[in-house]
Amino acid sequence: MPSFDIVSEVDKQEIRNAVDQLNKEVSARFDFKGSDARAEQTDYELYLFADDEFKLGQVMDILIAKFTKREIDVRCLDKGQVEKISGNKVKQKITVKTGVESDLARKIVKLIKDSKLKVQASIQGEVVRVTGAKRDVLQEVIQLVKGGITELPLQFRNFRD
């Protein structure tokens, strides 16, 4: 029986490259001269630092541009609250969402079941596995999920015949 997995993954090395490019650009830009604006990464968490909220917004815009240039979908970014740290400086935590969360996985399974296609969808941790009798039906499911789910970037992996 043919099957495939629906996942949401982000390449950690591409995130690191985007953050490095952001830090290079911020250090070279004239409007950030003398500023302590920067970005730091720990696994799938990013921390943006700046002198004030306006500059933090500019750093965020640069981050989005660098992610887009490296073909990382910005829908996977979960922005936290802006926190004040020593003096006027501000910090913002950004989490990069990976894996299909259980609520979204249930929504995907419900979408597939409501379509009345002859496939079985099951949730396996942070992956949704779809199994069907024919490849054509599985390709219809891929198109259905691509059109119906827009909250998170999804990839279709592990296609087996």
From Swiss-Prot:
<protein>
    <recommendedName>
        <fullName>Nucleotide-binding protein Neut_0623</fullName>
    </recommendedName>
</protein>
<keyword id="KW-0547">Nucleotide-binding</keyword>
<dbReference type="Pfam" id="PF04461">
    <property type="entry name" value="DUF520"/>
</dbReference>
<comment type="similarity">
    <text>Belongs to the YajQ family.</text>
</comment>
<dbReference type="InterPro" id="IPR035571">
    <property type="entry name" value="UPF0234-like_C"/>
</dbReference>
<dbReference type="GO" id="GO:0005829">
    <property type="term" value="C:cytosol"/>
</dbReference>
<dbReference type="InterPro" id="IPR036183">
    <property type="entry name" value="YajQ-like_sf"/>
</dbReference>
<dbReference type="InterPro" id="IPR035570">
    <property type="entry name" value="UPF0234_N"/>
</dbReference>
<dbReference type="GO" id="GO:0000166">
    <property type="term" value="F:nucleotide binding"/>
</dbReference>
<dbReference type="InterPro" id="IPR007551">
    <property type="entry name" value="DUF520"/>
</dbReference>
<comment type="function">
    <text>Nucleotide-binding protein.</text>
</comment>
